[in-house]
C-alpha cells in the first residue's frame, strides 16, 4: 500500500509521495486520482469540499472520505448550520444572523458580553472572535460585513471545551 498526498504539507510529504494539483479544481483532483489509480481520496479542508471535490471524485466511482458539496454547506455558512440545527431540534447557542452594523449592535445589546462574532463565510478557522471588548467585536463584524455578501452570526457565549470529530460511517447505521 502506498500513500499519495497533495504537495505543500511537509508532515504528510514524509509519509507518502507528493503530487501537485489544484485542490480547488474537482476535475484536476479526479484527473490526478485516476492517473494514480488511488483506492480512496480523503478531502479534509473546507474549501475543496465546498468546491465539490468530494462529489466529483465520488461521481467518478472512487470512494471518498469527506462530505458532499451540499453537506459542506454546514461548514461554509454558520447561518445555514444554525438553521439546520434549529430545524432538526438540535440544542445550540441562541444566535442572530446580521448583514448590517445596526443588526450587529442590536444583537450585542440582546446577548451581552462576552461577544461571539462569527464570519458567515469560510475563514479557515480564523473567522471567530470572542471578546468582552465591544469595540473589538464591532471591528471584526464590520470587517466581515465589508465583503460582497458579507454576513456575521452573533451568538450567545457558551463556556466549555470545543470538540471537532472526523468519523467514518457506512451510510446506513
Whereabouts are the PLM-identified features?
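Short beta->alpha connector loops
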Residues: 24, 46-48, 98-102, 158
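Conserved ATP-binding module of the ATP-grasp superfamily
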Residues: 91-93, 110, 114-117, 130-168
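Short, well-ordered alpha-helical microsegments
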Residues: 49-51, 104, 162-163
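ATP-binding N-terminal substructure of ATP-dependent carboxylate-amine bond-forming enzymes
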Residues: 1-70
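Short, intrinsically disordered, charge-balanced linker/junction segments flanking boundaries
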Residues: 1, 169-173
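Short acidic-hydrophobic, aromatic-tinged amphipathic segments that line or gate anion-handling sites
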Residues: 18-25, 96-100, 131
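A conserved helix-loop-beta module that forms one wall/lid of the active-site cleft
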Residues: 67-127, 134
Amino acid at each position: 500500500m502506498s500513500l499519495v498526498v497533495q504537495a505543500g504539507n511537509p508532515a504528510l510529504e514524509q509519509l507518502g509521495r507528493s503530487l501537485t494539483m489544484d485542490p480547488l479544481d474537482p476535475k484536476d483532483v479526479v484527473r490526478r486520482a485516476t492517473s494514480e489509480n488511488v483506492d480512496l481520496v480523503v478531502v479534509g479542508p473546507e474549501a475543496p469540499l465546498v468546491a465539490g471535490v468530494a462529489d466529483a471524485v465520488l461521481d467518478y466511482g472512487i470512494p471518498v472520505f469527506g462530505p458532499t458539496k451540499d453537506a459542506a454547506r454546514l461548514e461554509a455558512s454558520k447561518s445555514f448550520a444554525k438553521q439546520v440545527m434549529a430545524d432538526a431540534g438540535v440544542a445550540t447557542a441562541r444566535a442572530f444572523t446580521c448583514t448590517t452594523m445596526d443588526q450587529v449592535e442590536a444583537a450585542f445589546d440582546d446577548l451581552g458580553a462576552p461577544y461571539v462574532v462569527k464570519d458567515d463565510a469560510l475563514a479557515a478557522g480564523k473567522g471567530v472572535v470572542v471578546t468582552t471588548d465591544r469595540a473589538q467585536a464591532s471591528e471584526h463584524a464590520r470587517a466581515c460585513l465589508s465583503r460582497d455578501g458579507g454576513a456575521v452570526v452573533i451568538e450567545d457565549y457558551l463556556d466549555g471545551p470545543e470538540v471537532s470529530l472526523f468519523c467514518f460511517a457506512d451510510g446506513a447505521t
